Curated annotation (Swiss-Prot):
GO MF annotations, alphabetized: ATP binding; ATP hydrolysis activity; ATP-dependent protein folding chaperone; unfolded protein binding
Annotated region described as A, given as residue ranges: 1-334
Keyword vocabulary terms for this entry: ATP-binding, Chaperone, Cytoplasm, Nucleotide-binding, Stress response
Region (C): 559-637
Protein name: Chaperone protein HtpG
PANTHER family: HEAT SHOCK PROTEIN 90 FAMILY MEMBER
Residue ranges, annotated region (B): 335-558
């Protein structure tokens, strides 16, 4: 280590202290991970300089052979990791090692505090860029010496991980470009000075990073520990399952094994290679708005970026891996990537291939596909919401799988649904809800189930959005059962139950009583509903809410109100089931005795029941309680 001047002691950002404690506590059985993280950071530093040097060749100082060197001093119990990458100046050291972005840190801390497993934390630290601090698991002190490319002054950062760090200027400015990390190991961690222990860790975690990793032996010779050959340049048959697993770990930052591997060399209009993985485990931050793409773009094996390039659409953000193209210029800027025609062609080709492979998998092994769908189905359906995404809409819909009233736990395709449609049925019917159990119990389904008409059950939040964008599949309209009461009337001949047919045959006298009661109900409920009508869909429940064709879906309207994007609440249609014992008794009572306070209370309570079943907030809870008490008091008189 070099002598220093102008030292300044600073305190860690408050969040760093929390991370240090939690990482060390959570990873005590996975200490190897610290070396993976430090080598990964060194590789990133080389990537950054390699990219920057494309526009400023002077930055590399005639030293363009990027590498990472690991050495040890067993007598002093020290471990060294150095690279000749971009390096850091004083402010970089403070920003990168003394603070962490608050949004990412808090999510990281939340995940650990929520009981994330030790292996889960291993994956999290790489995802959030807090892996550097894992060095304090094995080191009593960490010293970082660095000189940034293009600058002449080097700096030192050091800390015991106790809440403070010291920044100093290196007195001798002959320090090489890049970064050297010195770990003064704890006495019990001397195993990490063993050459074979280090080789095992590198082989396990860092074998396929893009730069050579060397071990500096006692003779001063550099022994290569990894294969820095780009794994994606090999043919499919040359890559073993173990190699895929190691590379997947490097690029994915999630646990488990890849669920699907997509390795293709494309030599058509645009030449590129992709090595993409779909994980078998859902990342914890899959739906976080700050989540970045995890597919890296290379040009002729030179890393360009994984940020600010829409080569992978958001609805495929579960993909991990790389795309390498020889058709893009090496000096392309991140800005010009946005509207690049070659990028757009690669994107279209990738989307096409992914959706095609997903459809094949769904058709050949639905049991295995169900695992994918439970992890990433709701993400894939986000693509249906994009109004501009009409090109792949049919392919997306073909890859989608749904639960339905046809089977309790089997997933179906829309093709399956269409094949089972009843004669005379013109629509694909669906119902949205919060969860499968509650949707299956919805009164909205009763008339469809009794007539043997299948209904698709949608329970992901995204379903409320795409069903307002997608109007049909293979020219068959999609329709919510909440709007389908008139359809059931037209499909009455499809009833499979004689009992239902008999129920639909009413005497003139009975029909008049029902019509009169419906008018009375509309008068009592007045401004609380848009209308009251006899339901064609209810068989077991007394009431339900409905909306007219062309009206906004109930759940979508509620969402927009909650997001302050809608400042009113529309009135709904109240449907009543005149065959339900409660409603039948009310109709008879009204026909025999006319209007009454009890009937008014019952109508309000039935409306409230319908609202509760649809997840609607009651307009007046006190009124609901008072009417309920009045009815209960009458029962116990």
């Amino acid at each position: 280590m070099q002598d220093v001047i102008n030292s300044e002691k600073l305190k860690f950002d408050a969040e760093v202290g929390k991370v240090l404690k939690l990482v060390i506590h959570s990873l005590y059985t996975n200490k190897d991970i610290f070396l993976r993280e430090l080598v990964s950071n060194a590789s990133d530093a080389c990537d950054k300089l390699r990219y920057e040097s494309l526009s400023n060749q002077d930055l590399i100082d005639q030293d363009s052979d990027f590498k990472i060197v690991i050495s040890v001093d067993q007598d002093k119990n020290r471990l060294y990791i150095s690279d000749n990458g971009i390096g850091m100046n004083r402010q970089d050291l403070i920003d990168n090692l003394g603070t962490i972005a608050h949004s990412g840190t808090q999510r990281f801390l939340d995940e650990i505090n929520n009981g994330t497993s030790s292996q889960g934390v291993v994956e999290l630290i790489g995802k959030f860029g807090v892996g550097f601090y894992s060095a304090f698991m094995v080191a009593s002190e960490v010293i970082v010496e660095s000189r940034k490319a293009g600058e002449s002054i080097g700096y030192q950062w050091k800390s015991h991980g106790d809440g403070e760090f010291t920044i100093s200027q290196l007195e001798d400015n002959q320090i090489s470009r890049g970064t050297k990390i010195t770990l003064i190991l704890k006495p019990e961690e001397s195993e990490f000075t063993d050459r074979f222990r280090i080789e095992h860790i590198i082989t396990t975690y860092s074998y396929h990073i893009n730069y050579p990793v060397y071990f500096l032996n006692d003779k001063g010779e550099e022994e290569k520990l990894n294969s820095d050959a780009a794994i994606w340049t090999k043919s499919k048959g040359e890559i073993s399952a173990e190699e895929h697993q190691n590379f997947f770990r490097t690029v994915a930052h999630v646990g488990g094994e890849p669920w699907m591997i997509l390795h293709n060399k494309n030599e058509g209009v645009v030449e590129y290679t992709n090595l993409l993985y779909i994980p078998s485990i859902k990342p914890f931050d899959l739906f976080h708005p700050d989540r970045k793409c995890s597919v890296k773009l290379y040009v002729n094996k030179v890393f360009i970026t994984e940020d600010n390039v829409q080569i992978i659409p958001q609805y495929l953000r579960f993909l991990k891996g790389i795309i390498d193209s020889s058709d893009l210029p090496l000096n392309i800027s991140r800005e010009t990537l946005q509207n690049n025609k070659i990028i757009e062609k690669i994107k279209q080709s990738i989307v096409n291939r992914v959706l095609s492979e997903l459809k094949k998998k769904a058709e050949s092994d639905i049991k295995d596909y169900k695992k994918f769908w439970e992890n990433f189905g709701s993400v894939l359906k986000e693509g249906l919401c994009e109004s501009m995404n009409t090109e792949f809409r049919e392919e997306l819909m073909s890859a989608c799988r749904f639960y339905s009233t046809y089977s309790d736990d089997s997933l179906i395709s829309l093709e399956d649904y269409i094949e089972r449609m009843k004669a005379g049925q013109d629509n694909i019917y669906y119902l949205t809800g919060n969860d499968l159990d509650s949707v299956k119990k919805s009164p909205q389904l009763e008339g469809f189930i009794s007539r043997g008409i299948e209904v698709i059950l949608l329970v992901d939040p995204v379903d409320d959005f795409w069903t307002n964008v997608v109007t049909d599949y293979q020219k068959v309209p999609l329709k919510s059962v909440i709007r389908a009461d008139e359809d059931l009337e037209k499909l009455a001949h499809l009833d499979k139950s004689e009992e239902i047919k008999e129920n639909e045959d009413e005497s003139v006298d009975s029909k008049e009583k029902v019509d009169t009661f419906v008018k009375y109900a509309a008068q009592v409920l007045d401004k609380l509903v848009s209308s009251v009508r006899v339901s064609k869909k209810l068989t077991n429940s007394p009431v339900c809410l409905a909306v007219a064709d062309g009206s906004m879906d109930i759940r979508m309207e509620r969402f927009l109100r909650e997001q302050k994007q809608l400042n009113y609440k529309s009135t709904k249609i109240l449907e009543i089931n005149p065959k339900h014992p409660i409603v039948t008794k009310m109709i008879d009572e009204h026909a025999n005795a006319g209007e009454s306070v009890t009937l008014e209370n019952m109508l309000h309570l039935l409306l409230n029941q319908a609202c509760i079943l649809e997840g609607e907030e009651l307009q007046d809870v006190s009124d609901f309680a008072e009417r309920m008490n009045n009815i209960l008091a009458k029962v116990y008189q």
